[in-house]
Amino acid sequence: MPQIVILPHADHCPEGAVFEAKPGETILDAALRNGIEIEHACEKSCACTTCHVIVREGLDSMEPSDELEDDMLDKAWGLEPDSRLSCQAVVADEDLVVEIPKYTINQVSEGH
């Protein structure tokens, strides 16, 4: 099974994390199953950007984002070329290195 490496994040996993993912599951589902509480305000329906992550390694192994995900990502805080919504990004057969951005759009709008 592929592994996901979550880079250290002060709030979500200060030490970082490494866990196995099931091919075909989303990055978000794998993270939640392993105790990493990535925010997902829209309950995984691709209607917000709170689960935005940056795939630092392994992006090429995944299916590309669709038009709806791209439209939502345009609203994300800290958008980068390798950004994905973790609720839509399906794990393939290669390991991934994932960074959770410092803020979500909710935190920015609330002044954190």
Swiss-Prot record:
<keyword id="KW-0249">Electron transport</keyword>
<keyword id="KW-0411">Iron-sulfur</keyword>
<keyword id="KW-0479">Metal-binding</keyword>
<dbReference type="InterPro" id="IPR001055">
    <property type="entry name" value="Adrenodoxin-like"/>
</dbReference>
<feature type="binding site">
    <location>
        <position position="48"/>
    </location>
    <ligand>
        <name>[2Fe-2S] cluster</name>
    </ligand>
</feature>
<dbReference type="InterPro" id="IPR018298">
    <property type="entry name" value="Adrenodoxin_Fe-S_BS"/>
</dbReference>
<feature type="domain" description="2Fe-2S ferredoxin-type">
    <location>
        <begin position="1"/>
        <end position="104"/>
    </location>
</feature>
<dbReference type="InterPro" id="IPR012675">
    <property type="entry name" value="Beta-grasp_dom_sf"/>
</dbReference>
<feature type="binding site">
    <location>
        <position position="87"/>
    </location>
    <ligand>
        <name>[2Fe-2S] cluster</name>
    </ligand>
</feature>
<dbReference type="InterPro" id="IPR011536">
    <property type="entry name" value="Fdx_isc"/>
</dbReference>
<feature type="binding site">
    <location>
        <position position="42"/>
    </location>
    <ligand>
        <name>[2Fe-2S] cluster</name>
    </ligand>
</feature>
<dbReference type="GO" id="GO:0022900">
    <property type="term" value="P:electron transport chain"/>
</dbReference>
<dbReference type="Pfam" id="PF00111">
    <property type="entry name" value="Fer2"/>
</dbReference>
<dbReference type="GO" id="GO:0005829">
    <property type="term" value="C:cytosol"/>
</dbReference>
<dbReference type="InterPro" id="IPR001041">
    <property type="entry name" value="2Fe-2S_ferredoxin-type"/>
</dbReference>
<keyword id="KW-0001">2Fe-2S</keyword>
<dbReference type="GO" id="GO:0046872">
    <property type="term" value="F:metal ion binding"/>
</dbReference>
<dbReference type="GO" id="GO:0051537">
    <property type="term" value="F:2 iron, 2 sulfur cluster binding"/>
</dbReference>
<dbReference type="GO" id="GO:0140647">
    <property type="term" value="P:P450-containing electron transport chain"/>
</dbReference>
<keyword id="KW-0813">Transport</keyword>
<comment type="similarity">
    <text>Belongs to the adrenodoxin/putidaredoxin family.</text>
</comment>
<protein>
    <recommendedName>
        <fullName>2Fe-2S ferredoxin</fullName>
    </recommendedName>
</protein>
<keyword id="KW-0408">Iron</keyword>
<comment type="function">
    <text>Ferredoxin are iron-sulfur proteins that transfer electrons in a wide variety of metabolic reactions.</text>
</comment>
<dbReference type="GO" id="GO:0009055">
    <property type="term" value="F:electron transfer activity"/>
</dbReference>
<feature type="binding site">
    <location>
        <position position="51"/>
    </location>
    <ligand>
        <name>[2Fe-2S] cluster</name>
    </ligand>
</feature>
<dbReference type="InterPro" id="IPR036010">
    <property type="entry name" value="2Fe-2S_ferredoxin-like_sf"/>
</dbReference>
